Each structure stands twice: as structure tokens, then as C-alpha cells.
């Protein structure tokens, strides 16, 4: 336990400022640490996760029991649960991140001016990253590891629902840092579930360079409204799958069911299915049947409801709802134009997909839909940094500045200019 953890949690401002100071100091050391040391810390952290899998599971069981007692939804409980496979996936994720190319020091561009100045644009760490998240404890491993790989210090504040699980995972990351001879303060976990700690984090501009909030809409809205620190964020994942008139029916069926039902509680889960009227009679009966058999509640417009009595009426609110549950809204549209208009009106700019064998229609969709991730003939559940080959992601950003889409190692760096001269003076 470091000194910050020994401070009384009754003094939240003092506690958080101390954590911030330590993070800033550790970040300066980490920014200069060789890639070999950062990778060694990740590999040692992975080994610690495997060695402590039983202890992590016991702490997770406490959180799961408390979550059920609080009445958390099945979707939130699914996010909270750490099965042996998920613990192993965290360890493998750290190893995958260690295997990624080192982004720090990469020369992005270089040129020489007529006056002889040689200029390079070089990747460098951002500095200190604050991560605020709710019920998904694996974020502790993913976020800590990505920040470490990119040479950033991290301050992790998990939600009260995952408090015990997150602390157990953090202890493994700290063990990895120790084993590699790096400062433990490079990855700190806020040692209190007190919500006042979040309020402090959002004001700590002297110590934190960017904050990544991951959680429900209320958390993101609060952070967006109160933060004085820049953010990487997305408000919600209101994802669409559009089945075009020239979709392959079998492909459309399997992809759409996966996009909705593989894991309903993730932000890449499809929440609205749009079906072209020209293919509705072919695709809707088997699609509605498959979704219902998978346990999905169906809500649809009048045309959709005509195909099955199992479809309840969709309200105007449904088209703007991120369910994060086994519920989906379905609408029949006249054509690609109407699908594009619906997505423009209701998308959260996260991930939207078209299913079609028409290359021109696919290209138009990919060009005109203004979301961070646009897909053709692939499940929206692939909206994930790990699936993009990034090792993992710290979150998905739908913003317009710096990072957009999955925020991986490269997105956790900025750049500076190195200018080399031979005594030039400006006239």
C-alpha cells in the first residue's frame, strides 16, 4: 500500500491532490522509461492476474452479491461478472498490449526547411490519464495497461459496484510495476467509492491531462457538465444495423442476431434494426423468430408488427433509446435514403452498419453516415479496440478532437516537434 492509500478517506480533497501529485511525478519517470521496462511491467502484471485469479474471483463474488442485492439489471451484472475466462482474457490482453509496437518516440513526419532547420514530429505520452468507470472491472486492467504502454500515468476510479474487483486487479498491476522497477504510482486506484472523489478528479487540471469516462448515460452527462479537464467520451452507443434491399438473407440473419444478442450490455450492441421494404417479407419472419427464440423483446413500427404478433409497438422514444438489454426496435424503411435519414436523426455517432451485396450502396453508406465507426457486412459488436488489433481500448470516443473511435495505445499519445539547427537566427 502506498502513502496515498494510507491517507484518511475522510479528507477527499487532500487524498485526491496527493494522488494527483504522485501521478504527475510518476508520469515524468514513465515517459522516459524504456519500452522494455514498460513491457516487462505488463507481462509481470499478466502473470500476477493468473496467479491471483482465485482471489480476484472471491472479490468479484462480493461485488456480484452486493449488485444483486441492489437490484442491478442483468446487463449490468453481466458487465460486472469476472468469469475464469474473463480473468484469463484480461491477462492475455496485457500480453497483447505488451506485444504492440512502442508508440513513444515514433517519428510521424520529418522535413528540412530551406534555411537548414530539420524538423521532426514525434509521438510522446499525453501525461496523466484519469479513467472513471462503473460496473465493468476489466477496465482496470485494460485502461491501466494501455496508459502504461503509451508512457502515461493513470488514475483509475472504478464504481462502487466493482470496488472490490477493481482493487484486486489493481494490486496485480502494481505488482507488475514493482517487478519491472517502475514507480507503483504510475497506476493508482482511488481507494474510496465516495462519489466526491469523482468531483475532485474533474477539477484537477494541474495533475490530470485528459479524463476518459466509461459508464451509463448519467455518469457521462455529469462528467461532461462538470469536468474542467478535457475528455475522451461517448454519451451512448445507439447503434443501427440496416438490412439493405440487396442484402444476402442468410448473412443478414446471422450478422443481425449476433449484433444484437452476442452481448446485449456492450456499447456496440445494435439497438435499432432498419429493414428495406423490398426485402422485409423475406428477412423479417425468420429474423423476428430468431431474435425471439434468443430471448429478445421486440418493438416495431406498424409494418414490422404485421409480420409477427410477438412484436410490440415502438414509441418515438424507442428510436432514441440505448437499451443495453435484450430489447430491440425494428423499423421498415423505403430505401437507403430513408435509412440514412433515420440514422442521421437518431444515431449517437458510435457504430452503424449496412448489410448488402451492393458495393455502391455500401460505399455510399460508409461515406455518408457520420459515425466514429461505420461497417459493411459485419456485426456492430466488432466495435472494440481489441477486435481492431489495438490490444484493447480505454474507451470509444465519438468526439471531434484528437481521438475518434476506439481509443488504443496510439490515441493515448500526442506529438511534439523536434527542431535541429546549426545556429540559425530568424530575420
UniProtKB/Swiss-Prot annotation:
Primary localisation category: cytoplasm
Stated name of the protein: Gamma-glutamyl phosphate reductase
UniProt record similarity statement: Belongs to the gamma-glutamyl phosphate reductase family.
GO molecular function, one term: NADP binding
Phylogenetic placement of the source organism: Bacteria, Pseudomonadati, Pseudomonadota, Alphaproteobacteria, Rhodospirillales
Class of enzymatic activity (EC top level): oxidoreductase
Presence of keyword Amino-acid biosynthesis: yes
GO cellular component: cytoplasm
SUPFAM superfamilies the record matches: ALDH-like
The enzyme's E.C. designation: 1.2.1.41
One Pfam family matching this protein: Aldedh
Function in brief: Catalyzes the NADPH-dependent reduction of L-glutamate 5-phosphate into L-glutamate 5-semialdehyde and phosphate. The product spontaneously undergoes cyclization to form 1-pyrroline-5-carboxylate.
Pathway: Amino-acid biosynthesis; L-proline biosynthesis; L-glutamate 5-semialdehyde from L-glutamate: step 2/2
Subcellular localization(s) per the UniProt record: Cytoplasm
Catalytic activity: L-glutamate 5-semialdehyde + phosphate + NADP(+) = L-glutamyl 5-phosphate + NADPH + H(+)
Keywords for the protein's UniProt record, in alphabetical order: Amino-acid biosynthesis, Cytoplasm, NADP, Oxidoreductase, Proline biosynthesis
GO biological process: L-proline biosynthetic process
